[in-house]
Amino acid sequence: MGWRFVVKISFLILSFVMTPAYSEENNFGNQNALVLEVSVPATEERTALVFGFTMAMLKALPETVYKTSTVWTEELNEFKGARLVDLLAAIDARPKSVIAWAINDYMAEFDPTQEGWNEALIAYSVNGKPMPVREKGPLWIVFPYYESPKFRSDYIYSQSVWQLNRIDVE
């Protein structure tokens, strides 16, 4: 066995292990499965980094609750999660922009100077239950839509990424 074979197998195993877990069957009950990847570019102080977050790690961040309805749901719902700004502060990221990706490669770009930026919530539960993939989970970026008209625009709706699995900080 050559070293190239060992490197290829090691990379394949690491890719499998480091890939966020999106199995509908496990319904994200495993709090230690990776559900979100966050990449941060290199700075003068550090190299580029990729952070893997488990559901337990997200729940360890300050929790925020929004009671709101959405254009995709019929009733008032209670969304619990971590604000995007709190997640980025936890990894000392200072974004010029943020791109949020869904498992189907839908993406939305966030501008930190935009009004309402601080209210983007990475929701991990709705009405006290985890969200399976078939119900826009396991992670869904939501806003307090009915708190203010500024959250009821096509632009904000387009940033409401469900099935969130990756964030690229630029």
Predicted feature residues:
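N-terminal intrinsically disordered, low-complexity segments enriched in P/E/S/T
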Residues: 24-170
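Sec/Tat signal peptide C-region and signal peptidase I cleavage site
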Residues: 19-23
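N-terminal secretory signal peptides that target proteins for export/translocation
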Residues: 1-4
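Bacterial N-terminal signal peptides
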Residues: 7-17
